[in-house]
Amino acid sequence: ILPTGDGMALVFFNSVHAAFKCAVDVGKKTYKHPQIGLRNGVYSGPVVPVKDINNNPNVSGSGINMAQRCMDAGDNDHILISNGVHQYVNQMDIPGLKFEDWGQVIVKHGSTVHMWTAYGPNFGRTEFPTWRGTKKAEFKSE
């Protein structure tokens, strides 16, 4: 667990399944408490442990950066995952688990990430993020 100012990052070095299950489990616990304002982004990529300028534990790498981009694309209660994560977790045995393909989402610096939203009866959401404007403006056409 790494503090990030007004949030935190949970880093899983060895299991994309564990990272995704954690996002779902936390989503279930906070689903009925919208005042918490939690968004989840899950991405699988290189992450290495480092020390920050104050010698505190931290991580670096595209994995943590892209997980942040996935999270930033959502509203409260979204569980947004990259296409690579979806390929690993789409058959997990989680009651009611469903996915919606959002395609190529434009993120920071104009780059794109193929994202899916994960949801179920008491976690996640499918609605397009209200703060991002229209779907057409934020998604790259295929």
What are the roles of these predicted feature ranges?
Residues 1-21, 25, 29-63:
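Catalytic core of nucleotidyl cyclases, primarily class III adenylyl/guanylyl cyclases
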Residues 12, 38, 73, 116-119:
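Aromatic-enriched hydrophobic runs in primary sequence
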Residues 17-21, 39-48, 52, 60, ...:
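An N-terminal, helix-rich hydrophobic module
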Residues 28-32, 72, 91:
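Secondary-structure boundary motif
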Residues 76-141:
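Cytosolic regulatory/linker segments at or just downstream of nucleotide-handling modules
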